[in-house]
Amino acid sequence: MTRSPFRRLVFGTLRRLLYLWVRSETINQSSFTLNLDRSRPVFYALQSPSISDLAVIDTECRKAGLPRPVLSVAVGNLIEPSAYFYLTPAPDWLGRQDKRGAPPTLERLVAAVSQNPGEDAQIIPVSVFWGQSPDHESSAWKLLFADSWAVTGRLRRLVSILILGRKTRVQFSAPIHMRELVDQNKGHELTLRMSQRLLRTHFRNLKSAVIGPDVSHRRTVVKGLLDEPLVKQAIIEEAERENITQEKARERALSYGNEIASDYTYSVIRFMEVVLSWFWNKIYDGIKVSHIEGVQEIAPGHEVIYVPCHRSHIDYLLLSYLLFRNGLTPPHIAAGINLNMPVVGSLLRRGGAFFMRRTFKGSPLYTAVFTEYLHTLFTKGFPVEYFVEGGRSRTGRMLQPKTGMLAITLRSFLRNSRMPIVFIPVYIGYERVLEGRTYLGELRGATKKKESIFDIFKVIGALKQRFGQVSVNFGEPIRLAEFLDGEQPDWREQELAPQFRPDWLSETTHRLGERVAQHLNEAAAVNPMNLVAITLLSTQKLALDDQAMERVLDLYLTLLRAVPYSPHTTLPEGNGRSLIEHVKGMDLLAEQKDALGKILYLNEQNAVLMTYYRNNVLHIFALPSLLASFFQSSSRMSREQILRYTHALYPYLQSELFIRWPLSELDEVVDQWLAAFVEQGLLRFRNDAYVRPEPSSREFVLLTLLSRAIAQTLQRFYMAIALLLNSGPNTLNPEELEDLCTVMAQRLSILHGLNAPEFFDKSLFRHFIQTLLDLRVLRKDRAGKLSYHPMLGELAEGAAKRVLPAEIRLSIRQVALHSNEEEQNAGNESGAA
């Protein structure tokens, strides 16, 4: 095509005409990030003949300063008139393709590199996507012309250009070095076939990652579910149980399938992209994305399950938007059935949502249909998204994982593990969450309302506020096969029946949920709101001198940079002063001036709201805050003492906050933090002991503020222990202890003026009690009453003395004693009645 100047002129004219309409871009700037050896010739491999694709690739190469595919190139003595070839040859006039032969250019390349030991050629696979969508059998007319798995003809491509040409994406992939293949010394024919196979596999995996696997239309999928053995058996059992005909039970199963299944539609995805592009840049100050390149590398050839944290209803839309913008297939998203409302439900369904009921109890047929639907998605390799927390976090903490979807995923993988499953944790951090005021009411004790996507529209009146930036961090992937190898090494040899439910499933699913939560927290995006919140909420009056605030924030930034929480954690740019100005610009930080300077403070409403943003990063501050707490009641401690008390308390903090380090790594991390404290003057190391600064020093004030970040958590631990010890063994069951803890915490919050409703969150006490049971510090007798190990007393009188001031411990013990007396009096009155 480029052998003569005339043909080059024709090609250039066609390209310019094409770009009167077409707009193209590379996926994730892939044309600019190629690791090319500029001294070696470059060739471009295209999957199939297309003059329009070649024109787009040539344009993107010119933009990126890459060698152009339409110009000649030399490999040793071989001179090729152009630097591209098609892996699949053009069809003849009857539409037939001979896929057995190799591209002539590739054949000559293999020969040239083989004959010249000093030569190499770099082959860059390039794909052009005219719109992105999974293949449907029937759908909106625009979707008919989007890239799919169907064979594309000239007329279809022309219409695709007209309809979708303004959203054209190009993926340049890592180069294949021909020298590496030739040096395997397999001979000309084998090397040629190996090159073709590598390219075919690459194009297939890339297409699956970008436009989704070859998935049939929704109606076909739903009807296909009814023929699966698991669902057929459930239909028979439903008919017998409900005393109805099998045909009636089959119709019921079909209705369940239609209720559940998504109706993925490209036109809706494209519409959402346009709307959301406006939204993220109008309401928010854009989106900051980190570590998505790891997802782009792992997506081809894997069943990807995205497991984001859940902070807002717009989480549903955010991840799909980002994936689409970065050249990855938007996932099928598990959504609560409450969102399946008129108009909104249809829009979400066409955007990839599939709907699930809050509980499957009492409906085995529904369970079978839902389970089989997910199994179909997993085995076809279609990306899926679900929230392991279940609902949105109202407190800003990572909620305890709900293991239902994880269990379904595990059982599906045990049935069919040919498609490797990888979980991708996604941390979504808002500087200001849209539903913040709604959460504020619930934090203050208002009854939790039923979730509805219309919660978003309730905040429209507040959109004049500044909402800051959204951060999305992709965490370390969890490969399910590797996880199971560590938990159950013989899992591959076990039964693979659809209803197989091994004895170890529950415990393994629980540990998988914990692993996901830990990886989510590892990917936390620390923002200015988080750091200002954790600083001011650690002061007694929720206020701090402007200069002192700047020093604290600078210290926190320095410490977090010195001892990174994880490679996937991100920190804000700038210094303490820039963080203060940023939060002030969002009207969440009040200021009062006097003759001595400026005081920054939180009003009552914002103080409660800021607990949400503090809790986002509490897991990052937990360990350094615990270490700082030791020096509030002790002026000096040896390393051995610090490690002993840290090991005593750490398991409870780790369990509640999903902290990443196992006990085996704890000593090393503690040493890193102690070294950072010494470096910043928060501690001194003298005579084999760590010594705190003078109580009147600035450094001691900083150390004290840091210690208070985790103070309320430690106080809750001590409350439960004090109530248990005062009650005596075999007196309370877990529910009674939980209720007493909640009442006691409410009392203490009034007595000490704590404006943090989560301080008496019943679920936190419930989890702490369960952790004590898991660690065998507590035991249940036959009547369900709690007895305790002697180490509980040691925990209260040893470790607690090190981390809680004497007045706090005394106050807790007094309230605990009073609570126990009231409980006993109530019991006596009940007995007398």
From Swiss-Prot:
Example of a GO MF term: glycerol-3-phosphate O-acyltransferase activity
Q: How does it sit in the membrane?
A: Peripheral membrane protein
Give EC number(s), comma-separated: 2.3.1.15
> Which pathway is this protein assigned to?
Phospholipid metabolism; CDP-diacylglycerol biosynthesis; CDP-diacylglycerol from sn-glycerol 3-phosphate: step 1/3
The short sequence motif called HXXXXD motif sits at 310-315
- Please provide the Gene Ontology terms (biological process) for this protein: CDP-diacylglycerol biosynthetic process; fatty acid metabolic process
- Reactions listed under catalytic activity: sn-glycerol 3-phosphate + an acyl-CoA = a 1-acyl-sn-glycero-3-phosphate + CoA
Per UniProt, which keywords does this protein have?
A: Acyltransferase, Cell inner membrane, Cell membrane, Lipid biosynthesis, Lipid metabolism, Membrane, Phospholipid biosynthesis, Phospholipid metabolism, Transferase
Q: Which top class of enzyme applies to this chain? A: transferase
Where does the record place it? Answer: Cell inner membrane
Superkingdom to which the source organism belongs? Bacteria
GO CC entries: plasma membrane
Recorded family membership: Belongs to the GPAT/DAPAT family.
Its UniProt domain note says: The HXXXXD motif is essential for acyltransferase activity and may constitute the binding site for the phosphate moiety of the glycerol-3-phosphate.
Protein name according to UniProt: Glycerol-3-phosphate acyltransferase
Q: Which organism is this protein's natural source?
A: Pseudomonas syringae pv. tomato (strain ATCC BAA-871 / DC3000)
